[in-house]
Amino acid sequence: MVSQSLSALGACVILAAALPGAVSAQQAGVEPRADAVLRSMTAYLSGLKKFSVTTENTLEVVTTEGQKIQFTAPATMTVARPNKLVAQRRGDIVDQMMYYDGKSLTLYNPASQHYATVPAPATLDAMLDVAYEQLGLVAPGADLIDTRAYERLMLDVQSGVYLGTAVVAGQRCHHLAYRSTEVDWQLWVREGPQPAPCRYVITSKTMAGAPQF
């Protein structure tokens, strides 16, 4: 294997926009039912001590001619709070693994066998902050696996509505739609005592063609 700088390896990790200040649901004009579902989901996720998820990630690219092209990247992630994370994304434009053990953060590219490791904070939440603020990296699903997920999702929110229910991958889900300055986002949250997210769609409002992720 070949070691190299983490910031160089991180070029294929999706970058996040600058995070503005949080606002309350009332200030943002969020419907009470939408807020209740979001709070229920984030409380459920933050209360899980250990879990694994498999997702199908989609990245939409808009060409100079205005054509939208979609790329997919299946991803798996295992979290053990407070300080363990293993995540992998493999697809058309990314082949990457991320390891965090409470002491260090490592990115590894299986295809090129390049890796990079840096010291990391002792908790997952703190590592996610450092990865973004100092390295410009965002772990898969960072908005949802942070124990402060509600606060992260509510950053710069302008409105939120409850759109009813829909079936996603065989699961009956609550459908939420939120708007912020730079993005619109939708969540489909499973009904019942285990309100896990079944689908999460982000639409950019600042990029030409409004691509979705």
Question: Could you say what each language-model-derived stretch is?
Answer:
Residues 147-153:
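Edge strands and adjacent loops of beta-rich recognition modules
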Residues 21-27:
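Boundary at the C-terminal end of the N-terminal hydrophobic targeting segment
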Residues 10-20:
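Bacterial N-terminal signal peptides
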Residues 29-32, 56, 106-107, 116, ...:
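Gly/Pro-enriched, hydrophobic low-complexity segments
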Residues 29-114, 161:
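N-terminal mature ectodomain segment of secretory-pathway/periplasmic proteins
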Residues 107-145:
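Acidic/charged, solvent-exposed loop-and-adjacent secondary-structure segments enriched in E/D, K/R, S/T
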